[in-house]
Amino acid sequence: MSTDSIEVAIIGAGITGITLALGLLSRGIPVRVYERARDFHEIGAGIGFTPNAEWAMKVVDPRIQAAFKRVATPNASDWFQWVDGFNESGTDPRETEEQLLFKIYLGERGFEGCHRADFLGELARLLPEGVVTFQKALDTVEPAADNSLGQLLRFQDGTTATAHAVIGCDGIRSRVRQILLGEDHPTASAHYSHKYAARGLIPMDRAREALGEDKVATRFMHLGPDAHALTFPVSHGSLLNVVAFVTDPNPWPYADRWTAQGPKKDVTAAFSRFGPTMRTIIDLLPDPIDQWAVFDTYDHPPNTYSRGAVCIAGDAAHAAAPHHGAGAGCGVEDAAVLCAVLHMAAKKVNTAKTGSEGKAALITAAFETYDSVCRERAQWLVESSRVIGNLCHDEVYWRSHRIWDYDIDAMMRETAEVFEAQVAGVARN
């Protein structure tokens, strides 16, 4: 392991982990990514990125935003429309219209969607060969006996690795979060929000024939009592992505998993009193259907995202309900800040030729800077995502724009200022 560089281990090869890896590599920081799956595999269907997230992509590495644009599907309208999916008269959705409750301007090409796997595939192609090691499930992280090696990572297959810094991008069921916060602590786990989402992709020719062009060409939120659904086009308009949310007062029945395939009848029943548009959309979904429990960190938010040379990012840090459609974008913001602070720390290591203790102190300062800059905003997103489905127009408007209009450049300036203050504090001590 090099003595004049900061070597980083990233746990998890999802969108946040690979985005972060690309940004660090572009800044000359050595990275290894460890992924428990057999290959690149992004579960889920559609995903969208808001304007702030796209700006953060460019800050991390302009190739990332270019990769997203290659797979993104433009909306026919630059307005996000919230419609009454419940009180719709008539029987044929091609001849009826859901009442527009309100709409929010997204900006030009401001909230485009894509298929998750398509985007992850584009990102993976940007990675140099050998950066990602698959079938590596993390067991523990602890200081290495030789402090020049930093942290010792033990995997469930009995192998080990070392790195100066460890970043957990391992999702909602994060092992790194458990290690960081304590396995039995309430903040170490995400908790059921008492909603689940039935998710599916409908071939666009079938959706267009059943619903009409206007209802499939752009982004809609269909509202009603105890259920609502988000629809938008993906895969260059060849598929309609559907996320149908159902309120569930019961505990999630599967202790060992948060996704399950189940009969569509429960989802059909939840939307049975809705208008013809939503009933038709549900009819077009497959049976059985993928059901996703919505877990988040709202009830027990972490009081820190870092400790020493270990930190968490993305869903591992701030798992949020998807009602804002901004969780993945918040992970990109995390990556932008982490790339910046680790680059600043690496430059100080290279110029000052610090020893192992000095390098460890700089990494700690970098991660504390990240926690200071990102955690408050990320946990606000978790809170707002939990409640937004029940809010009135004015609340939805300002909460949405608080996410979309975030000043990424100001965030990066704050990152530099906080890091320098952290380093100055280390020097005084």
UniProtKB/Swiss-Prot annotation:
Keywords, ordered alphabetically: FAD, Flavoprotein, Glycoprotein, Membrane, Monooxygenase, Oxidoreductase, Transmembrane, Transmembrane helix
UniProt xrefs under InterPro entries: FAD-bd, FAD/NAD-bd_sf, FAD_monoxygenase
Signal peptide location: none
Cofactor field: FAD
Positions in coiled-coil regions: none
Active site: R199
Entry's family note: Belongs to the paxM FAD-dependent monooxygenase family.
Name of the featured protein: FAD-dependent monooxygenase azaH
Organism: Aspergillus niger (strain ATCC 1015 / CBS 113.46 / FGSC A1144 / LSHB Ac4 / NCTC 3858a / NRRL 328 / USDA 3528.7)
High-level lineage: Eukaryota, Fungi, Dikarya, Ascomycota, Pezizomycotina
Gene, per the UniProt record: azaH
